[in-house]
Amino acid sequence: NDGIAKLVYGTRNQISQLLHGKDDRLFVVVGPCSIHDPESAIEYANKLLAVHKDFRQNLLIIMRVYFEKPRTTVGWKGLINDPDINETYNIAKGVEIARKLLIDIANLGLPAGTEFLDPISPQYVTDIISWGAIGARTAESQIHRELASGLSCPIGIKNGTDGSLKAAIDGIQAANHSHVFLGATKEADIAMLKTAGNNDTHIILRGGKVPNYDEVSVENTLTALKEAEINETIMIDASHGNSQKKFKQQIPVIESICNQISGGNDNIKGVM
């Protein structure tokens, strides 16, 4: 509906303005690791909505609504792939649940962000997504770089699982440009697709073998971004390698980020 369209396009534009230095708020992506229960997700969304409204002058808050999980080997791949979590793989049901949940969250007035993993599923949900991510395990993938170049929302690309920046920087450079590849249209036909390139891309520091949220790591990242002549906006993921997968460790990570920002670092524009 018009209300959802206004929310999504308005939030995308605000994120774009923020990425290009025209909005001085901090961009915050917050929410569960992945969605497994829509009812719990709506309960969470209602609580987050109050925070979203209270701090909207200083923070641009969107809800993390991840339906797909990249696996290092095997495991549950997320709500879209296996919505009943019983290895029945009712993907059609998963797509319907995911889309309905995104609509319900948007109707509350809360924008949503997600990770794009499967190259086909974005056709079913992207119109309700305000921001997207390419994860550490797929940052080097040509398919995902091409996908990012054609998505109509801002995209963050994570550093590699080992902590290296190269995959993310190369990915951003690739996503900035136009690509031609085979893909599915909205009518589910296979066709040659040509993308325009996505200039609303940025790096996400998620740590690796060691954290990379500290001041030295951030400065090293900024230097690398400048040398690559790409967007110098930095988002920091307080989880994953930066918290060594200990959720309570996210608090001192965020405190460090806040200290860096208050100390004058205006390249840190976002946190997860």
Show where each model-derived region lies.
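Glycoside hydrolase catalytic-domain groove-lining segments
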Residues: 218-222, 226
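Active-site-facing alpha/beta catalytic cores
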Residues: 58-213, 217-218, 240-241, 245, ...
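Acidic (Asp/Glu)-rich catalytic clusters
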Residues: 19-22, 49-56, 100-109, 193-195, ...
